[in-house]
Amino acid sequence: MRCPFCHNEDTQVLDTRVSDEGDTIRRRRRCAKCDKRFTTYERVELALPAIVKKNGSRVEYSHDKLASSIKLALRKRSVSSDSVDESIARIEEKLLSFGEKEIPSERVGELVMRELKRLDKVAYIRFASVYRSFADIESFESALKELK
């Protein structure tokens, strides 16, 4: 592991610990050259599928984009950030469980709507109105009836 201070390649591991969740290893290291200490984290990198948009273009999956979309729908709603993080984790687990290299954006949108419906009905309607491109009041009424 290269030292972030002097870029020397010779470093020594002083301490190794597994996180409480068991999915990350924390290593405390010391540089043999400059003697500075630093911490590294090791975790399994899971390859989430590429997203195929409606126009056929492909984009890399973005955790940040998913999180910002959900948070935008939940803006000014009383939903804890832990609940949001758990929902995002469930969506990502579902995407991984499909075992596909590519997945249509519509499928991701449906997963988001399912989670929002569980978290907050108002956020669900907000997201659905944009995602489903509601054009009129009848579209809103139809979505509201689905919630009842």
From Swiss-Prot:
* Swiss-Prot/TrEMBL GO biological process terms: negative regulation of DNA-templated transcription
Q: How is the cofactor bound?
A: Binds 1 zinc ion.
Q: Name one Pfam family in it.
A: Zn_ribbon_NrdR
Is this entry keyworded Metal-binding?
yes
Q: Where are the zinc fingers (unnamed)?
A: 3-34
Query: Which residue pairs form cystines in this protein?
Result: none
Sample GO molecular function, one term = DNA binding
Q: Which domain of life is it from?
A: Bacteria
Entry cofactors: Zn(2+)
* Sequence ranges assigned to domain ATP-cone in this UniProt record: 49-139
Q: Which UniProt keywords apply?
A: ATP-binding, DNA-binding, Metal-binding, Nucleotide-binding, Repressor, Transcription, Transcription regulation, Zinc, Zinc-finger
NCBIfam families found in the cross-reference section: transcriptional regulator NrdR
Which family does the similarity line name? Belongs to the NrdR family.
Identify the HAMAP family for this entry.
NrdR
Task performed by this protein: Negatively regulates transcription of bacterial ribonucleotide reductase nrd genes and operons by binding to NrdR-boxes.
Name under which the protein is recorded: Transcriptional repressor NrdR
Query: What taxonomic ancestry is recorded?
Result: Bacteria, Pseudomonadati, Pseudomonadota, Betaproteobacteria, Burkholderiales
Gene, per the UniProt record: nrdR
